[in-house]
Amino acid sequence: MNHSIIASRCLVFVLMLLATGAVMAGDPMKGRPLYEIRCAGCHGPEGVPQVAGISNFKMGEGLMKPDQQLLSFVKKGKGVMPGFKGILTDAEIMDIIAHIRTFF
């Protein structure tokens, strides 16, 4: 095989990974302190909400969506939940999502 074919196949592989969001996986250890600061006030330190009408992560509420959909939701906010676009980076939000997934 010549080098241009190998390089082309490698490029296609990397682009496929980027397109699927595989590179965006969050780190739950990095997400924990961010969750404690930004989310625990309403969702509780272990994912059990302190306020009525808020997702209970311990019960899996709100977690059955793909990471990209949750990322969009956290950035925009809805109802009493504020949006975090411009406050948290996409990587930080993905870290928080990874941490939240450890509750269920």
Question: What do these predicted ranges mean?
Answer:
Residues 27, 35-41, 46, 77-80, ...:
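Short pre-active-site segment immediately N-terminal to redox-active cysteine/selenocysteine motifs
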Residues 28, 32, 44-73:
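Gly/Gly-Pro-rich "capping" loops immediately C-terminal to redox-active cysteine motifs
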Residues 19-21, 26:
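N-terminal signal peptide c-region/cleavage motif recognized by signal peptidases
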Residues 74, 86-104:
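C-terminal capping alpha-helices of c-type cytochrome domains
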Residues 1-11:
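Bacterial N-terminal signal peptides that target proteins for export
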Residues 10-18:
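Sec-dependent N-terminal signal peptides
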Residues 68-81, 100:
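Periplasmic c-type cytochrome electron-transfer domains
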Residues 56, 80-83:
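Conserved beta-strand positions that form and line the central face of beta-propeller blades
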